[in-house]
UniProtKB/Swiss-Prot annotation:
GO CC annotation terms, alphabetical: endospore-forming forespore
HAMAP family: SspO
UniProt induction comment: Expressed only in the forespore compartment of sporulating cells.
Protein name per its UniProtKB record: Small, acid-soluble spore protein O
Family: Belongs to the SspO family.
Subcellular location: Spore core
Region listing for Disordered, in residue ranges: 1-49
Main location: other
UniProt keywords, alphabetically: Sporulation
Example GO biological process: sporulation resulting in formation of a cellular spore
Amino acid sequence: MGKRKANHIISGMNAASAQGQGTGYNEEFANEPLTPAERQNNKKRKKNQ
């Protein structure tokens, strides 16, 4: 099998800039409102980073 290109990298852009901070697991849903449960989890995770 050939090497698969990472999905979150937008072709045509600088590869390095596409992989910086902020390209997290939930990047596609970044502008959706969080549920109260998710907000709690977010706070916990922030502390651990």
